[in-house]
Amino acid sequence: MILVLFLLLLFQFPFSGFGQENVRRELDFVQHLISRNELRESLFLLHRIHPDDQNLTDSVNFLRGWVLYQQKQLDTSAFFLLKVSAESPLFQKSRFFAAYNLAHVGSLQQASSVMQNLSFEEESGISALKNFQMAGIALLQRDFESFSLNAINFKGQFNAFAQQEINLKGYANQLIDQPRRSPAVAGVLSAFIPGLGKVYAGKTAEGIAGFLYVGALGLTTYDFYRRLGPKNAFFILSSAVTGVFYIGNIWGSAVAARRQQIEFNHEMDQRILFDLHIPLRNFFQ
């Protein structure tokens, strides 16, 4: 760390106008820092390297994007990765990881466009990887028609993502077959029988608890009415409390149905993104 701090002080001025060999040495040192997980220091140095050569500029942009990717600053990472020119040997890796980063932050249309603009030789491994990534992005968009068109080409012939192709097909089936639980229906069900809407929403334990709680309050209120009459303060207070919990039971059931859909979709998105990520690390290792 002392050596790193010393070099940071030494390299406090931008490296513009330096010879190519000097810039290459600085980039080698940056890669050494990255390998030691000194990400902040490596990014500090990269901000100060401004080579005149296009190939070296591509290397700087790639490394900046790569460091930001490791720091999980995915939006900014994609910005720098997309600046790598088509002439660079890092172009393909940059585009694939940029598309993944964009998909991860929800910029699905842009991620799809990045992939669509790439062209490779048919039947090649990287062409199959492109097809796989586009299928995953389509699934994140819930575009099942586009997913099916890409999934036709899943052949399982490349070990880097053969299992992930199978996984994506499974996720597609789960998304297509997922029950569509309506918040309105959940609310109506709980209006008739407290807690039933939560059972409908897939929250059985919560539904049973709600039924018992509202039921117990209702029985208590009825007991006050039977013993003390409708004008008694205990009956009035108990009626008010029961009414509040009854209405809350209806509202809670509607929210539970909506929450269940959100949780399911979020979980599926995380699984898809995970399976999109693994092949990239395997293919470009």
Regions found by a protein language model. Give the residues of each.
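Hydrophobic alpha-helical membrane segments
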Residues: 59, 93-100, 107, 170-285
